[in-house]
A protein has these predicted regions:
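The feature marks non-catalytic terminal segments
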Residues: 2-5, 75, 83-115, 119, ...
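Active-site beta-strand->loop->alpha-helix modules in alpha/beta enzyme cores, enriched
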Residues: 2-167, 213, 262
């Protein structure tokens, strides 16, 4: 008597989180503990960074953005930063994805004031970025998205939010507070009213303090400029505390705490 074949067990994929980071460090600096905790809990974690293109022969302000970090003009600054990101993601348990869009200094923003000013009328990078995000959503089918609130007002952060707004639909999104800008007194919050109206979601990542620190410290080229060195990074993370704070659109993931919207982001 023939034995009927045994049907294979259905493949059940772990839940998936996709973090959309403007730059190569934003996700780790702002929510590295959350990324690590989700990875430790069995989630598949991907961090897709928007503005990572290497631009040969940088000029003007774009060149200054690498020379002020001690790099020579012929250095491939973004290749260095992508390598740092790969190291950081390995620490946090995430897969890095690098989208091929140029940073703001290569799109006509000529000084630091412009980076934190109004988005240029001719800067429409959010349209092709939205197309790329839509492709990622189709490919990865994330359970949850993470993205910045735009605290600090950097144009690249604001344009990423515009791009995500085009394609997010009813997705569940945790919007992070952009660190280190959020830790600075009177940091601009151009979208503050929007996010303060959403419920707050918090996650205690105290158990992953060291992993969060080591992930952030992997961005060695940025530590002097952003924090004054690794020791000061550690101090700033300690000052920020072990709780990472978000605003929530949609259904919250397990493990955190949800509260009402409030002033302060």
């Amino acid at each position: 008597m023939a034995v009927p074949p045994v049907a294979p067990a259905p493949v059940v994929l772990a839940p998936m989180v996709l973090a959309l980071s403007p730059h190569l460090d934003d996700a780790a600096f702002s929510c590295g503990g959350t990324l690590a905790q989700l990875a430790q809990a069995g989630w598949r974690v991907t961090v897709a960074t928007a503005f990572t293109r290497s631009v040969p022969d940088p000029q003007g302000f774009a060149l200054a953005c690498q020379s002020d970090k001690g790099l020579p003009p012929d250095a491939d600054y973004m290749a260095l930063r992508r390598a740092e990101d790969a190291a950081a993601m390995a620490v946090l348990g995430a897969e890095p994805r690098w989208l091929d869009f140029p940073e703001a200094p290569h799109r006509g923003y000529g000084d630091a004031r412009a980076l934190f000013g109004e988005v240029r009328a001719d800067d429409t990078v959010d349209a092709p970025l939205a197309v790329r995000f839509a492709a990622l959503l189709t490919e990865l089918r994330p359970t949850l998205l993470l993205a910045p609130q735009g605290v600090g007002g950097h144009v690249d952060h604001l344009l990423l939010i515009r791009a995500l707004d085009r394609v997010a639909g009813g997705a569940s999104i945790l919007w992070w507070r952009d660190f280190p800008y959020a830790a600075r007194t009177n940091a601009p919050q151009p979208l503050g009213a929007r996010f303060q109206a959403l419920p707050e979601w918090t996650l205690d990542v105290a158990a992953l303090t060291e992993r969060r620190l080591h992930g952030c410290a992997a961005y060695a080229s940025q530590l002097g400029f952003q924090f004054g060195g690794r020791a000061r990074l550690e101090e700033r993370l300690a000052e920020a505390g072990p709780v990472e704070r978000f605003r929530l659109s949609g259904t919250p993931p397990p493990g955190g705490r949800t509260g009402p919207g409030r002033t302060g982001g």
